[in-house]
Amino acid sequence: MHRLDDITAPIQQELLDFEIHFQNAMHADVPLLDKVTSYIVKRKGKQLRPMFVFLCAKMLGQINPITFDATTLVELLHTATLVHDDVVDDAAERRGFFSVNALWKNKIAVLVGDYMLSRILLLSIEKRNMDLLEIVARAVQEMSEGELLQIEKARHLDITEEVYFEVIRKKTASLIATCCEAGALSVGAQEERSQLRLFGELIGLAFQIKDDI
């Protein structure tokens, strides 16, 4: 049994149920859009971000429909950023398969990413999850700021250690922090939100440092 399997063992059923929620969230009535989103769904990753939401929620309470809403929102955001990142980086592959922009060109890839971001807004409003929308929106802002900060500093070749940590905190750690905070929020654990956000941020920093090394 792999180490990740050990970690996800307490939430295996929830992760399976999440796949259905995510598929429904990605569904589109426009045939071309639905074709692209179906392609993305079938080539899923390790689902680390939903894992953090579920584990934090289960640690503090009972997983419930709001928890599934939270996992769907963060995975929509993560997936949208991957699609947009591939356009920015002109990447031809993602997870061993052709990227969306490689198959359908940049214009469609950008619009698909935009569609997923719009789904975050609509699903949050439909479910009246304004607190979840707030922390996910903050993650969108920080991730965008981190990406632009990195581009700016790379052009001037003046990335200091302080700037490096600010970049990875915004680009990578902010989303993991959001996942952990969302897990706490979904079960009403208001007092633990800030601690779990910090926990997620530290994990995100460590993850990115290891990846960079």
Please place each PLM-identified region on the residue numbering.
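Mg2+-dependent prenyl diphosphate-binding active-site environment of isoprenoid biosynthetic enzymes
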Residues: 16, 23-213
